[in-house]
């Protein structure tokens, strides 16, 4: 089963997708604010393929990733789920490889692989011994240019993604509610359509639909190659030119995405299910990202998210769980790394014996207190210290750097945006955080999601 899609808000993010650490971890000695995060080397092939190399010689392994600047928000109307479906079908063979052969070879060589689809990008990766990097490039370049599909492989895989939807969404009340909340938050933008697709449209996806999407978007000049591990940029350049460099560029279409209208009224979505044991609630606000809306608020919102939702020492957890004892869990979530607008989420789960209405009232009181009194300079300073520490820890993992840089470039950011993230976070002031909160937390641009138990009859 592929790691096929992930939610808009990842629990761990750094800057262009921020990485948060448990508050219990002792921070390392902080490097100067101007220190590089990953210090990658970059170059572009003649056919437009961007290449990023993160040298890390701690172990003789590499992570090899290919990111395409296309995702579920780029699908034709009526074809929801085709980006994710194509991700599955990319493992079904080429002119020279049988279905599943790539995966079998990776497994025989002791490697790991996976792929994932978001609204903005699709990515494929392998982690393997460094002396198998050339093999990975040969196979990945082959399916970039030579994917071959037939109804014989497409039809059974359609059943696979339908079962994936049933298991991950239709049988999970929280996922169902999240789908409805997101559809209510984005009134016009395709972010309101689930990445996996609507079931009735998924059933109609065809071989021709998949090939058309592939031929439209999968090209070297719409891709980013990221290699992290025990390699040099020159080694990667030679291999990339040999395998990817021979693939011709394509004429790419514009990414046409409708924008959001002015939102005038709050919305509320309630879902009851006998599968729900404990009620919960969240409030989503339409929010700017690095690339859309009032983007000057993106970095302050990241600091605010650390203050409000950064673990068991955060403001919301401390006040609602520890001090008031009305909640079993409470926090917030915000990710700035999307092409278009994003969301800022508050959530609360009441403590057993506490009514959901009481927990909701306590959460809303905290939001009102934030808007009235703001955050303090001390809270901002502590949050920035924790966030800078997270950037240092992020260097330890091959996949973390490859993921952050790939995601950033795929959503319109630059390598410099990633490398300068600690400086940009350090420059955030309490005044900027409070201004961002006042700008974003407008109830008219919000959706409240309520998940309730439903007694079985």
Regions found by a protein language model. Give the residues of each.
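Bacterial N-terminal signal peptides
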Residues: 11-28
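Active/ligand-binding-proximal structured segments within catalytic/core domains
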Residues: 48, 57-106, 283, 294-308, ...
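Charge-rich, well-structured scaffold segments of protease-associated domains
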Residues: 2, 39, 44, 101-254, ...
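N- or domain-start disorder-to-order transition segments that initiate the globular core
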Residues: 33-39, 43-60
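Short strand-connecting beta-turns/loops that link adjacent beta-strands
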Residues: 56-59, 219, 276-277
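N-terminal secretory signal peptides that target proteins for export/translocation
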Residues: 1-7
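Active-site-flanking beta-strand signature of metal-NTP-handling nucleotidyl enzymes
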Residues: 63-66, 280-285, 345, 447-449
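His/Glu-based metal-binding/catalytic segments typifying zinc-dependent metallopeptidases
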Residues: 166, 183, 252-313
């Amino acid at each position: 089963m592929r790691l096929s899609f992930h939610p808009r808000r990842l629990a761990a993010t750094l800057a262009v997708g921020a990485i948060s650490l448990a508050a219990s971890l002792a921070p390392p000695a902080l490097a100067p604010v101007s220190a590089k995060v990953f210090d990658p080397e970059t170059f572009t092939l003649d056919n437009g393929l961007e290449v990023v190399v993160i040298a890390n010689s701690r172990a003789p392994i590499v992570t090899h990733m290919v990111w395409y600047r296309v995702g579920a928000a780029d699908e034709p109307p009526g074809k929801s789920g085709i980006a994710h479906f194509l991700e599955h079908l990319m493992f079904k063979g080429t002119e020279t490889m049988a279905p599943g052969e790539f995966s079998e070879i990776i497994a025989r060589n002791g490697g790991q692989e996976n792929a994932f689809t978001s609204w903005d990008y699709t990515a494929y990766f392998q982690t393997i011994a460094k002396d198998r990097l050339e093999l990975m490039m040969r196979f990945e370049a082959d399916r970039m240019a030579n994917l071959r599909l037939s109804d014989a492989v497409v039809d059974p895989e359609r059943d696979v993604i339908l079962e994936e939807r049933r298991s991950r969404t239709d049988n999970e009340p929280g996922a169902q509610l999240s789908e409805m909340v997101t559809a209510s938050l984005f009134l016009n933008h395709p972010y309101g359509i689930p990445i996996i697709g609507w079931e009735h449209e998924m059933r109609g996806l065809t071989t021709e639909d998949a090939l058309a999407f592939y031929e439209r978007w999968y090209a070297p000049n719409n891709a980013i190659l990221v290699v992290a591990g025990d390699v040099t940029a020159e080694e990667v350049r030679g291999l990339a030119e040999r395998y990817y460099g021979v693939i011709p560029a394509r004429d790419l279409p514009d990414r046409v995405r409708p924008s959001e209208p002015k939102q005038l009224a709050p919305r509320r979505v309630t879902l009851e299910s006998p599968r729900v044991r404990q009620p919960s609630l969240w409030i989503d606000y339409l929010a700017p990202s690095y690339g859309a809306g009032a983007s000057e608020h993106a970095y302050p919102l990241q600091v605010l998210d650390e203050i409000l939702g950064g673990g068991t020492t955060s403001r919301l957890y401390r006040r609602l769980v520890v001090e008031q004892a009305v909640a079993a869990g409470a926090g917030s979530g915000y990710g700035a790394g999307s092409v278009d607008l994003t969301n800022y989420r508050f959530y609360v789960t009441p403590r057993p014996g506490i009514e959901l209405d009481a927990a909701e009232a306590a959460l809303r009181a905290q939001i009102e207190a934030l808007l009235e009194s703001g955050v303090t300079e001390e809270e901002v300073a502590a949050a920035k210290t924790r966030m800078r520490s997270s950037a240092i820890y992020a260097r330890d993992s091959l996949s973390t750097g490859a993921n952050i840089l790939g995601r950033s470039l795929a959503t319109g950011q630059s390598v410099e945006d990633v490398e300068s993230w600690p400086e940009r976070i350090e420059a955030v002031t309490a005044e900027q955080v409070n201004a961002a909160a006042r700008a974003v937390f407008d109830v008219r641009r919000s959706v409240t999601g309520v998940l309730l138990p439903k007694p079985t009859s």
